[in-house]
Amino acid sequence: MTSWRRAVPAVALSALAVATTAGCDNGWWTYHRDPVRSGVDSQLAVAGRVSAAWTTNLDGAVYAQPLVVGGTLVAATENDSLYGLDPGTGAVRWRTHVASPVSRSVLPCGNIDPLGITGTPAYDPTSKLVFAVAETQLGGKVTHLLAGVDPASGQQRILRPVDPPGSDPTASQQRGALTVTAGRVYVPYGGLAGDCGAYRGTVVASSTTGTGPLISYTVPTAREGGIWTPPGPVVDRSGNLLVQVGNSAATAGAWDGGDSVLKLSPDLRLLDSFAPASWAWDNAVDADLGSTAPSLTANGYLLAVGKSSTAYTLRAGHLGGIGGQVTSSQLCAAYGGTAVAGNTVYVPCTDGLRAVSVDSAGAPHVLWHANTAVTGSPVVGGGRVWSLNPSGALYGLDPRTGAVTQQLPMNQTSRFASPTLFSDSVLVPTLTGISAFRGA
């Protein structure tokens, strides 16, 4: 085990200069802004302190991170609605009710009631549609519908079922963010809270035209192995998809694909994988890697953190198979999405956000450890790191030190909520709608 070495905090500042925009102009088109899930907006214009600007109540809780496309803020609710808002004022421009959500009483377990659109939508600049998945019932059966909506008008242009094959749709939850790349929209699936029923972690892909057959990859386990974490699939420099997988059925014998990092081709063939040597034990005690997504650094490494408090550094070009990590070290238990600025990864640890720098040899260095109340999935912009506490607080942190520079009260959020950065504003999804905070 490699020890975590404390480095000079100024490294964090230099890392902030390397922001990944991935061609999404000055909007926010997907979870954490770009397909690599950097969570960095180098164009955010925040000077001085921020203050509450507006709050708009919607028809349900907002678990998904809001998007900003062409000057319209797009929010998705657990009432299966998509909204277009004015990001400057919060005024509602349009509302599209995709379907009727599923009552918790219909489901075998779970902790969202009702269950509608949970995963963060994604915008496709080619079709000019925002894609979202709505959970609903058709003919008395639970199903998942992929909707494609014009972000300017709210007009729905695509609607098709995208249930994971070989799994019970009633036990399958679409929590992870959608990913758009290579002319397809990718939809990850895990299970409901409680891991009940016959589900297996799956990624389903549809053409962005909404036509043609679906393709899919399913974790080769008897059950579980969820691909559930909010960031969804990450796209690497070669256009392949990276996912982290939760605990699966096997606790002895042959590895069955769980507790892992998987690399999938655009047509969803398995290309490469990593699993800790402790995968069987991790599966047995629910201490797997499925609670976050892969964090790609600028120098060619991948940092994978999960529930067990062990962080693994992998080579992005060769994941290493079972036990093939570059380093493994004790860091923290982490849930949600990281932010990545250059070679610095901001990790949403359950005992407080950490900034970790990965050097040219793959060795990790803890730069700072924030206040224990700062646990939300971070984003970076305007000279600050932004994070939420679900009890109702927005934090702005100094990226050099992790010190809290500002704490603002707000409505409660879901556990994995993450803010969106746009223009001079921080836009926050809450259990009642959207709240905006603006720089002075």
Report residues per predicted region.
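Extracytoplasmic/lumenal domain signature
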Residues: N26, T30-R33, R37-G60, V68-L73, ...
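Secretory targeting and sorting signals
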Residues: M1-D25
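Periplasmic/luminal catalytic loop of GT-C fold multi-pass membrane glycosyltransferases
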Residues: T118
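Aromatic-lined, polymer-binding surfaces characteristic
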Residues: R175
